[in-house]
Design a protein with these regions (language model features):
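Active-site-adjacent "subsite" loops/lids of carbohydrate-active enzymes
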Residues: 65, 69-81, 159-209, 307-308
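Aromatic- and acidic-residue-enriched segments that line the glycan-binding/catalytic groove
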Residues: 114-126, 160-186, 224-246, 291-301
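Aromatic-lined carbohydrate-recognition surfaces of secreted/lumenal glycan-active proteins
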Residues: 153-157, 220, 255-303, 357-361
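Substrate-binding cleft of secreted/luminal carbohydrate-active enzymes
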Residues: 313, 323-335, 354-429
């Protein structure tokens, strides 16, 4: 969570973050919540954390990334029939592996995999941004997933505009070209400025259009809020800070508040547009290192979401702002800088006593990859993750990155997970 350090998650970004020890908020009164939290607020009890609630229900998910045609479609420009065929093949493979949820990336770069009145058709479909593919991928995905007993979670990236820095390459009608003041170039990419209230309102309208049109089971964000930091570069939001940051003691605090507002307003919008639809986020796996904050994990990660992405993921869980969280724990058991075992325990403790469901993001893409250490050459590594996580009652399941690896399973790591842990089908938690 696409998750990841999701999140998408491009493999190049994941590799850079891994090399640095990484992996791939204060708004006043509580906003209305979607899904589980809304039901609890209405006086209906949320399921208690613990083995009794885990037994009949377990998240078994897969991310299906569309950015750069990572997982689907296999390449741009396929016929509508070929794209449908590839999509249903992914859904069928999920059913065969006794998974129960597909998290489909439907807004990878400020574009759309449905006929949006706000943003252009995604170039991953036809190779040309704005070109109608001749069918409705998101509508079809929801219908075909539900026909197979799968949940379909719509995965959106809120602020990424493009994986390049040239606005003229965007289709002429793109909102970023109509509002160049909304755009911040950074790290060779284009980003919407999270510090502008008009940007935050716009991206919510664009995303909620899909929720209004289709009975998606959940809305899903990945790990990209403010962009991952790049040495020697500055994300230029000084003008927005001068206009809107006066109430904050630092730009970092203001930025965290901007992301907090996005999360809370989106939760309220989902509940307003389609009540009962859940809202989940898949952050980078380290909130803060304990050396930075005693509440943090015993890790030495090069990226900390609170400080670097300005995403206070711990608070979102502790204060029940979201229905589920899927931290991207894309490291092996025993990894010195970010041990999977340490982080699984830290997130379990963070979720303890909350209504936020905890699922763990799993780096299936690393299994058998030549550049990965020996732990990832063992097809049993991921199965060990699930065995270890079962000792924490707060862990209600796992999501695998990503669809291409579920389909190919080069060293049999997914097959081992299925054989060891997914002998019978399971419904996703509600």
């Amino acid at each position: 969570m696409a998750r990841m350090s999701r999140r998408v998650f491009t493999l190049s970004a994941l590799s850079v973050l891994a090399a640095t020890g990484g992996g791939a908020a204060a708004c006043g009164a509580a906003a209305p919540r979607s899904g589980t939290a809304a039901r609890a607020a209405a006086g209906r009890p949320a399921p208690e954390a613990g083995r009794a609630s885990r037994a009949p229900a377990e998240m078994r998910g897969v991310w299906l990334a569309t950015v750069t045609n990572r997982d689907w479609p296999s390449r741009p420009g396929l016929t509508a029939a070929a794209q449908r065929g590839e999509l249903t093949a992914h859904l069928d493979k999920a059913v065969r592996d006794r998974l129960n949820t597909v998290i489909l990336q439907v807004r990878p770069t400020a574009d759309a995999l449905w006929p949006s009145p706000y943003e252009p058709w995604s170039e991953c479909l036809t190779g040309r941004q704005g070109r109608n593919p001749g069918w409705d991928p998101l509508g079809t995905a929801v219908r075909e997933a539900h026909a197979r007993g799968l949940e379909l979670h719509a995965w959106f990236n809120p602020y990424r505009i493009a994986l390049h820095a040239d606005p003229t390459r965007l289709t002429a009608s793109h909102p970023a070209r109509r509002h160049p003041d909304w755009v911040v170039p950074y790290d060779g990419r284009l980003h919407y400025n999270p510090g502008l209230p008009e940007v935050r309102a716009f991206v919510q309208r664009a995303m909620l259009d899909a929720v209004a049109r289709y009975p998606v089971d959940a809305v899903h964000f990945d790990d990209y809020f403010y962009p991952y930091p790049v040495a020697g570069q500055t994300f230029d939001d000084a003008d927005a800070y001068d206009r809107h940051g006066g109430a904050f003691g630092s730009r970092a605090a203001w930025r965290r508040d901007n992301i907090d507002r996005l999360v809370r307003e989106m939760a309220a919008g989902i509940e307003r547009v389609r009540p009962g639809t859940r809202f989940g986020i898949s952050p980078f796996g380290v909130w803060r290192n304990a050396a930075t904050d005693p509440r943090g994990s015993d890790t030495q990660a090069g990226v900390q979401t609170y400080d670097d992405l300005h995403a206070d993921t711990r608070k979102w869980v502790r204060e029940n702002w979201i229905d589920y969280v899927v931290p991207q724990l894309y490291w092996h058991i025993g990894y010195a800088d970010a041990d999977y075992a340490e982080l699984a325990a830290w997130w379990a403790e963070t979720a303890r006593g909350t209504r936020t469901h905890l699922y763990l993001g799993e780096a299936l893409y690393k299994a058998g990859a030549a550049e990965e250490p020996s732990a990832w050459q063992d097809p049993v590594e991921l199965s060990r993750h699930l065995t270890l996580a079962a000792a924490h009652p707060q862990v209600r399941g796992h999501v695998f990155f990503a669809g291409k690896e579920v389909a190919a399973d080069p060293i049999g790591a997914m097959a081992r997970v299925v054989a060891d842990h997914y002998e019978r089908s399971a419904k996703p938690p509600r």
